[in-house]
A protein has these predicted regions:
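Alpha-helical transmembrane segments of multi-pass membrane proteins predominantly involved
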Residues: 1-548
């Protein structure tokens, strides 16, 4: 009645999943603490969130020391050098955002528990994206990142600009998600698989080129929204201005980096060998993004909007290595290095903006007049971040731009050289608006002669120490900024014992894994010996007389 049929359970590598598991545990702890702690003791919530992020970074470090590439779920989830570097970036950036949020959220009378729960949920989505090697995994991780971010962008419920920020971000995000999902469905229809490696193998045959090109365009457009590339950037300035400042910093760095990570995975794995289909589109996208972003940033009078358009221009630089047919490993290394350095200097710039706003109550560029008179340290730190964003040596931004220029020029064709010229021109344009803000701080007098000091919370001071230290360290130590093979894709394998461990006389052979069986009902009717055998041949027909 029942037949035994083999069922193979998936193998889980708990060490590889440890960063995400720690984050999930932190989510639960923060939510329970917010539920049961009295109102006066909820100040511990940012500490719990920060400790959880640092705790998640510990298994990232142990996995890096272990050095083994790991894969799970049929290759849909990989832990390699690329994934580990990006997980570390997301966790450290998230920790800095928690530091920036500590006093801002407490003093603004916001719901702290829900805020940190949503922030950690979004960071969890980013860590999953770093390991995603499958269309479904990428999409689910993007939604896990985006849905909490929509809510965080509109966190200031009683502010008109805050409501506008949340609404614009949500509506544009839903549209981009639909476009991206349609492109992914076309890829699945052509390849018959959601694994990026399988898609790359099928697309290499060169068949169904029109459908493949359409799928690539839809996917790039969908990710173009996530990274605020022109012309899909229109949500960014208004959202950045209306969202809480720590969330603005978070969206401008971590969220954008996650979008670039997913785009790089798709292009360099699934679209490998399809340069003719996507690189002309990406070339135009990169050139327009950096040029329009810089030109509009020149006209801004609000420092947050200026940094928003600066982020648009920086996105063009990060797209550049993908837009030319150069060395894939060098392009990937340049992108990851740029993302890491950009995170440090941009988060630092937003930390200074928050510190100055505590005194001036304004985000206008004119409110930065005379910062050097009442806080030389803040003015000096902002100068470091601004000139690093402009790519002035010997700061980290210089190294980031050098790696991108090198990856582009190494492609060695006219398209690459043309894009390098566009990048050089835009670097000069960007220096103009960064220098204008620096001039306000160092050369203009303080408004109304007010030179009273800025009172900075310890959390913002800690964020400034971390970001400034990394920005300077990446600049003076090129070996630290050039991630090289630390950011390369690799062919992940399941974790196995090393040869030395296997050959050891003390090694105990592991028993073969148990194969559970599932009882499947046998739908065939029971055998009855009194019934004729259905497999026996039919008897020969005999003539039967018919009586009229």
């Amino acid at each position: 009645m029942f037949a035994a049929q083999e069922f193979v359970s998936p193998t889980l590598d708990w060490h590889a999943l440890a960063p995400e598991l720690v984050l999930v545990g932190t989510l639960v702890v923060v939510l329970l603490a917010d539920l049961f702690l009295p109102e006066g003791r909820k100040g511990i919530l940012p500490s719990l969130a920060g400790l959880g992020l640092l705790g998640s970074a510990i298994p990232v470090l142990t996995l890096a020391v272990d050095g083994a590439d790991r894969s799970m779920f049929g290759g849909a989830y990989a832990v390699d050098n690329f994934a580990l570097v990006l997980k570390a970036l997301f966790l450290i950036s998230g920790y800095v955002v928690v530091l920036l949020s500590t006093n801002y959220i407490a003093e603004g009378d916001y719901a702290e528990g829900e805020y940190y729960f949503l922030l950690l949920s979004s960071i969890l989505g980013m860590t999953v994206i770093a390991s995603a090697r499958d269309l479904i995994t990428i999409f689910v991780a993007l939604e896990l990142l985006s849905i909490p971010a929509y809510l965080l962008a509109g966190w200031r419920k009683n502010d008109v600009k805050g409501n506008e920020a949340g609404a614009k971000y949500y509506l544009m995000g839903v549209f981009a998600t639909g476009v991206l999902l349609y492109g992914m469905s076309l890829l699945y229809g052509v390849a018959g698989s959601t694994l990026l490696s399988d898609i790359g193998a099928v697309l290499a045959d060169g068949e169904n080129l029109p459908i493949i090109t359409l799928a690539i365009v839809f996917c790039v457009v969908g990710f173009g929204f996530k990274v605020s590339a022109v012309p899909f950037h229109t949500w960014a300035p208004d959202t950045y201005e209306g969202a809480p400042t720590p969330i603005t910093a978070f969206l401008s760095v971590s969220s954008k980096a996650a979008g670039f990570v997913a785009l790089a995975e798709l292009i360099l794995i699934a679209f490998a060998g399809q340069e003719a289909a996507y690189q002309p589109f990406l070339w135009v996208l990169a050139a327009l993004t950096m040029t329009i972003g810089n030109m509009v940033a020149l006209r801004q009078t609000n420092v947050v909007r200026m940094l928003a358009y600066s982020g648009v221009a920086q996105a063009g630089f990060i797209l550049a290595p993908l837009a030319v047919a150069g060395d894939t490993d060098r392009s990937l290394s340049a992108i990851v290095s740029y993302l890491v350095i950009y995170a440090a200097m941009n988060l630092g710039a937003f930390a200074v903006v928050m510190a100055v706003a505590r005194k001036t109550g304004s985000g206008e560029i004119s409110s930065f007049s005379g910062v050097f008179e009442y806080s030389p340290l803040l003015a000096g730190l902002m100068g470091i971040f601004l000139f690093s964003l402009a790519g002035i040596p010997p700061l980290g931004g210089w190294q980031a731009k050098f790696f991108v220029f090198r990856a582009v020029v190494d492609a060695g064709d006219n398209w690459a050289y043309g894009l390098a010229v566009v990048m050089a021109i835009n670097s000069v344009i960007a220096l103009a608006y960064y220098a204008n803000l620096a001039r306000q701080m160092f050369m203009e007098p303080a408004p109304d002669g007010d030179t009273s000091p800025v009172h900075m919370p310890v959390s913002i001071s800690a964020a400034l120490v971390i970001t400034a230290g990394l920005t300077v360290a990446f600049g003076v130590s090129p070996w630290a900024a050039d991630l090289g093979d630390m950011s390369e894709f690799s062919t992940p394998v399941a974790a196995e014992p090393s040869p030395d461990e296997a050959a050891s006389p003390d090694a105990v052979p592991l028993p073969p894994p148990a194969t559970p069986t599932v009882l499947v009902p046998d739908l065939a009717p029971p055998f009855d010996p009194t019934l004729p055998d259905p497999s026996a041949p039919l008897p020969a027909a005999s003539a039967v007389p018919v009586t009229p």
